[in-house]
């Protein structure tokens, strides 16, 4: 399946709502109030040449979530690192871009008054990259590493 993208996350109707109809993430968030909202976006945008455009979309999303979830604690999660071998493949999915976009997410979180969760330490090796055994494609986590990521979130929120 195709993941979500920061520029269309508020308009793509790819969520099944409680009434069975398709809706947006924003529609789903409007169905009830939550104590916490977690945002995990950015991997699909690693090739974007304009970081300010990414930050603008991210800010718009946070502002909208703050409007419809005024009492929720909102967390922006860092983009997880990729494996060293994946990072060296010569395209936009590399750990240099991950670091650049994570800095942007951190800045937006600070500017909008939400929490930034640096999840890298949950899954990265000593060198800061995703261990080769953590992923079959260098990007997406195997279940053991999903558990590490989830436990980090539970322990830190």
Could you tell me what each predicted segment is?
Residues 29, 65-67, 109:
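N-terminal cationic-hydrophobic initiation segments that often serve targeting/anchoring roles
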Residues 40-44, 66-98:
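Active-site segments of SGNH/GDSL-like serine hydrolases
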Residues 23-26, 61-62, 102-103:
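A generic local structural motif
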Residues 1-57:
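Conserved SGNH/GDSL esterase-like catalytic core that processes O-acyl groups on lipids
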Residues 35-40, 73-78, 115-118, 140:
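Structural recognition of the beta-strand scaffold that forms the well-ordered cores
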Residues 81-157:
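Catalytic His-Asp segment of secreted/periplasmic serine-dependent ester chemistry enzymes
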Residues 51-61, 98-101:
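Charged helix-capping and loop-helix junction motifs
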């Amino acid at each position: 399946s195709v993941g979500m993208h920061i520029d269309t996350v508020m308009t793509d109707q790819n969520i099944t709502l409680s009434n069975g109809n398709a809706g947006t993430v924003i529609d789903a968030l409007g169905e009830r109030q939550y104590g916490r909202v977690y945002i995990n976006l950015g991997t699909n945008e690693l090739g974007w040449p304009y970081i300010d455009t990414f930050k603008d979309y991210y800010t718009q999303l946070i502002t909208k979530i703050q409007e419809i979830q005024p009492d929720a604690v909102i967390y922006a999660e860092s983009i997880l690192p990729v494996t060293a071998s994946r990072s060296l493949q010569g395209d936009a999915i590399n750990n240099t871009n991950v670091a650049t976009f994570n800095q942007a997410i951190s800045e937006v979180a600070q500017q909008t008054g939400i929490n930034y969760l640096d999840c890298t330490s949950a899954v990265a090796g000593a060198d800061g990259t995703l261990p080769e055994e953590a992923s079959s494609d260098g990007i997406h986590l195997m279940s053991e590493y999903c558990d590490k990521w989830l436990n980090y979130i539970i322990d830190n929120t």
